[in-house]
Amino acid sequence: MSNDAMSNDDVIDELNKLIETCKDGEYGFRACAEHVKSTQLRQVFTSRADECRQGATELQTLVTRLGGKADTGSSATGTMHRGWVNLKGMLTGDSDQAALNECERGEDAALERYRDAVKKSLPDDVALVVQRQYEGVKRNHDQIRKLRDQMRSTA
């Protein structure tokens, strides 16, 4: 982190970007859950969607506490990605593998977004929340990658 403190508005903007990321993840995992055949994957995706929703809610609370207006929706990129997940799920015969591939792509984007955020000079209380959520995104990413690799090796 640099020593240059961020303005309150910049902190709110950064948190709102992370809220969009969480919402993208929530909706993406739910879309993937709708297309998989495996009950285990459906449960994993639903659980990840719930974690993303909880993360967004936590960040929205911080934004409100800082006097800002919290984002409540996802990004345009996330909406396009969900459309691609839906289309790909309908077109491919191996929807479980396709869903895992798409979820990993989504988690790659979330990981990059959080990696950028933890490098910023956020207030200590905000930085703690962002760092904790970043660790969760890394765990999600690793779990999805592991499931994807396991599925590839059994195919």
Give the location of each predicted region:
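Charge-rich, acidic-biased intrinsically disordered regions
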Residues: 5, 43, 50, 70-87, ...
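Short amphipathic alpha-helical/adjacent loop interface patches that line ligand
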Residues: 26, 49, 56, 84, ...
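Conserved alpha-helical segments that form or flank metal/cofactor-binding pockets of metalloenzymes
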Residues: 40-78, 144-147
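Alpha-helical scaffold segments that form or flank carboxylate-/histidine-based iron centers
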Residues: 10-18, 39-57, 96-100, 125-137
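A generic hydrophobic-segment detector
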Residues: 112-155
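Short, charged, low-complexity loops and linkers
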Residues: 2-12, 34-37, 61-66, 88-95
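N-terminal/domain-start segments enriched in small and hydrophobic, helix-friendly residues
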Residues: 2-20, 64, 80-81, 149-153
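Acidic/histidine-rich alpha-helical segments that form the ligand environment
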Residues: 14-34, 81-130
